[in-house]
Swiss-Prot record:
<dbReference type="InterPro" id="IPR005225">
    <property type="entry name" value="Small_GTP-bd"/>
</dbReference>
<dbReference type="GO" id="GO:0032790">
    <property type="term" value="P:ribosome disassembly"/>
</dbReference>
<dbReference type="Pfam" id="PF14492">
    <property type="entry name" value="EFG_III"/>
</dbReference>
<dbReference type="InterPro" id="IPR041095">
    <property type="entry name" value="EFG_II"/>
</dbReference>
<dbReference type="InterPro" id="IPR053905">
    <property type="entry name" value="EF-G-like_DII"/>
</dbReference>
<comment type="similarity">
    <text>Belongs to the TRAFAC class translation factor GTPase superfamily. Classic translation factor GTPase family. EF-G/EF-2 subfamily.</text>
</comment>
<feature type="binding site">
    <location>
        <begin position="146"/>
        <end position="149"/>
    </location>
    <ligand>
        <name>GTP</name>
    </ligand>
</feature>
<dbReference type="Pfam" id="PF22042">
    <property type="entry name" value="EF-G_D2"/>
</dbReference>
<dbReference type="InterPro" id="IPR005517">
    <property type="entry name" value="Transl_elong_EFG/EF2_IV"/>
</dbReference>
<protein>
    <recommendedName>
        <fullName>Elongation factor G</fullName>
    </recommendedName>
</protein>
<dbReference type="InterPro" id="IPR035647">
    <property type="entry name" value="EFG_III/V"/>
</dbReference>
<dbReference type="InterPro" id="IPR000640">
    <property type="entry name" value="EFG_V-like"/>
</dbReference>
<dbReference type="Pfam" id="PF03764">
    <property type="entry name" value="EFG_IV"/>
</dbReference>
<dbReference type="InterPro" id="IPR014721">
    <property type="entry name" value="Ribsml_uS5_D2-typ_fold_subgr"/>
</dbReference>
<dbReference type="InterPro" id="IPR004540">
    <property type="entry name" value="Transl_elong_EFG/EF2"/>
</dbReference>
<keyword id="KW-0251">Elongation factor</keyword>
<feature type="domain" description="tr-type G">
    <location>
        <begin position="8"/>
        <end position="294"/>
    </location>
</feature>
Length: 705
């Protein structure tokens, strides 16, 4: 079966933004105008099509990136006949910091992105975080300045903020007409026409016309800047322009596309998704400026089992290449069970095929294949390069795994997931729910690699670990709704770590004589701190056989056994290195086990000598507040052992930046609300580990020892 849409008419893109910038509303409108959604869902009614998990609808924030396929016929200048439809695969990504991992996962499979800004707030902290992630994955993007109908909306301020905050060059291609209550439509700077929305058909129709006199000067000025950016992409166009000839509309679009794909600049449009103004021009811009799978450089993978991960196997969007795809999201669907969202990079896949999961080295059979529309699904028989589809019934595949042709194995990606910074104990309210809870938690952990479940060996409690309070709140909530488990949760605990203060040399002798063969081993260890974030390393410097080779793995095993439980309060030990420099052995009484015990005991004693210290996670906090509350908020952050690093004006508010220990941030949202009458908001994310002050360290040791 041939593909319905040629690859140059595919657009795989994500919609990314800060929480509350109106991202889900934008996705909704896109689905409405492209005919995939028959009624408009409003986020503040809790009925948006993309937000299909119940809690997302209740909290009005997007948590999981639902992938949706829809189609758009480019609305051409003056006529719509004969313009081929494009196939849009949209990934809706969350904007809350606790879900940054979701954004990372979706960026790994996108070709382009639409960044949605709030016209009043501009570039907010989470926008910067997501922008940096998109830079890392080299994702071309366009910006939609949304909420132009809001009080205080300022399109040009947002354009300057993009340049100040992200360092990108912002090039407006469409300017809003009016703002706040007087938003009428926009001016397309490429064609120099007004689009004015009239009537109450939810923005489905508009009138195009000449630019009004009051806007001509500002439009000419910004069009000049746009053309200057465009002609820099092509020497001939630049020469023509310097001779006084402007490029025609198709040439201008082609040059703007070239610059966007090369990440030289970012096209910017304005409008209001909620008021249904400016969404069709945004869709046109997606087609004009964002990449198709053919515009993306070859994806370089490596051979399974290659320890150096030498990326020398190319895969590109071509149906004739061997099949390869990346599983980027697992979701539980109440009707179909587990769904694996997969981006196909090369080749084709048919129902019934057997493919290789090259990350795990296991084969999977393709049962049901679906094209997803938010939470409706369409069964398909075949999928092609460039498609984003959902597969049901895969047994061993998790987020970040590569699926590929059995005969042509390749690994596309190794996704790294951050360590959790917060944990809570959880137990079912009734004993009967224990098994249901365990199954539910295992499923949630399969969906979300930044969430971990462990059992505390000493207390037997089940521990949930995640990226923030909201993250764990929502998971506990999902246990209740999807798995019908009522759970009691303990107070949140901080994920402390331990490390050492200075280098020591320590010798430990292990002797045991109790009739028969005894145990003997002596090790001399040098234990040293490393730079923060460098982790652990072990080196044997034994010369002349002071410790026979076969016993050295025992030494390393003994050292590693101490890493999970440090000498101060039993927390994992990080950022240190150990060298085995000398030792003694006995021909009869020495064994691997004896050396393991000697190393373990030597480490415990040596670390205490090395000035073991407790480390705590420190969060980067940003509070955005009306000016009158700044004094109180700064005082409160300082009282939480926070270090305020600066403040700056943000629109008509003030942004306060600080580093605060996570231990002092629990329940902060309630304090902030009461201090600012609900008008301030904050974001925080893990930044680094810092030593805990001595008096507090003592309390923690007494509590956990």
């Amino acid at each position: 079966m041939a593909r319905d849409y040629p690859l140059d008419r595919y657009r795989n893109f994500g919609i990314m933004a800060h929480i509350d910038a109106g991202k889900t509303t934008c996705s909704e409108r896109i689905l409405y105008y492209t005919g995939k959604s028959h009624n408009i869902g409003e986020v503040h009614d809790g009925a948006a099509t993309m937000d299909w998990m119940e809690q997302e609808q209740e909290r009005g924030i997007t948590i999981t990136s639902a992938a949706t396929t829809t189609f758009w016929e480019r609305t051409e200048d003056g006529e719509t006949a004969d313009t081929p439809k494009h196939r849009l695969n949209i990934i809706d990504t969350p904007g809350h910091v606790d879900f940054t991992i979701e954004v990372e996962r979706s960026l790994a499979v996108l070709d382009g992105a639409v960044c949605v800004l709030d016209a009043n707030a501009g570039v907010e902290p989470q926008t910067e975080t997501v922008w940096r992630q998109a830079d890392r994955y080299k994702v071309p993007r366009i910006v939609f300045v949304n909420k132009m109908d809001k009080i205080g909306a300022d399109f040009f301020n947002c354009v300057h903020m993009i340049e100040d905050r992200t360092g990108a060059r912002a090039v407006p291609v469409a300017i809003p007409i009016g703002s706040e209550n007087e938003l009428e439509g926009l001016v397309d700077l490429v064609t120099m026409q007004e689009w004015v929305y009239k009537g109450d058909d939810l923005g489905a129709s508009w009138v195009k016309g000449e630019i009004r006199d009051s806007l001509k000067d500002v439009c000419e000025e910004w069009r000049g800047k746009m053309i200057e950016a465009a002609v820099e992409e092509d020497d001939d166009a630049m020469m023509e322009y310097l001779e006084g000839n402007e490029p025609d509309v198709p040439t201008l679009r082609a040059l703007l596309r070239k610059g966007t794909l090369a990440l030289h600049f970012v096209p910017v449009l304005g409008g209001s998704a909620f008021k249904n103004k400016g969404v069709q021009p945004l869709l046109n811009a997606v087609i004009d400026y964002l990449p198709s799978p053919l515009d993306v450089v070859d994806y370089m993978g490596f051979a399974p089992g290659d320890e150096n991960e030498e990326r020398n196997i190319p895969r590109r969007a071509d149906d004739d290449m061997p099949f390869s795809g990346l599983a980027f999201k697992i979701m539980n669907d109440p009707f179909v069970g587990s769904l694996t969202f997969t981006r196909i990079y090369s080749g084709t896949m048919n129902k019934g095929d057997t493919v290789l999961n090259s990350t795990k080295g296991k084969k999977e059979r393709i049962g049901r294949m679906m094209m997803m529309h938010s939470n409706n699904r369409e069964e398909i028989e075949e999928a092609f390069a460039g498609d984003i589809i959902a597969l049901a019934g895969l047994k061993d595949t998790t987020t970040g795994d590569t699926l590929c042709d059995v005969k042509e194995p390749v690994v596309l990606e190794t996704m790294t997931f951050p360590d959790p910074v917060i944990e809570i104990a959880v137990e079912p309210k009734t004993k009967n729910d224990q098994e249901k809870m365990s199954q539910g938690l295992a499923r949630l952990a399969a969906e979300d690699p930044s969430f971990r479940v462990e059992t505390d060996i000493e207390s037997g409690q089940t521990i949930m670990k995640g990226m923030g309070e909201l993250h764990l709140d929502i998971l506990v909530d999902r246990l209740k709704r999807e798995f019908k488990v009522e759970a009691n949760i303990g107070a949140p605990q901080v994920a402390y770590r331990e490390t050492i203060g200075h280098e020591v040399e320590h010798t430990y002798t292990h002797k045991k004589q109790s009739g028969g063969s005894g145990q003997f081993a002596e090790v001399k260890l040098v234990i040293s701190p490393t730079e923060p974030g460098e982790g652990y390393s072990f080196e044997s410097k034994i010369v002349g056989g002071a410790v026979p080779k076969e016993y050295i793995p025992g030494v390393e095993k003994g050292i590693k056994s101490v890493m999970d439980s440090g000498p101060l309060a039993g927390f994992p030990v990080i950022d240190f290195k150990v060298a085995l420099v000398d030792g003694k052995f006995h021909d009869v009484d020495s064994s691997v086990l004896a050396f393991e015990i000697a190393a373990r005991m030597g480490m415990r004693e040596g670390m205490k000598k090395a000035g073991a210290k407790l480390l705590e996670p420190v969060m980067k906090v940003e509070v955005v507040t009306p000016e009158e509350y700044t004094g109180g908020i700064i005082g409160d952050l300082t009282s939480r052992r926070g270090q305020v690093t600066g403040q700056e004006p943000r629109g008509n508010a003030v942004a306060i930046n600080a580093f605060v220990p996570l231990a002092n941030m629990f329940g902060y949202i309630n304090t902030l609300r009461s201090m600012s009458s609900g008008r301030a908001q904050f974001t925080m994310q893990f930044d680094h580990y810092d030593p805990v002050p001595a008096n507090i360290s003592q309390e923690i040791q007494e509590k956990f020892a």
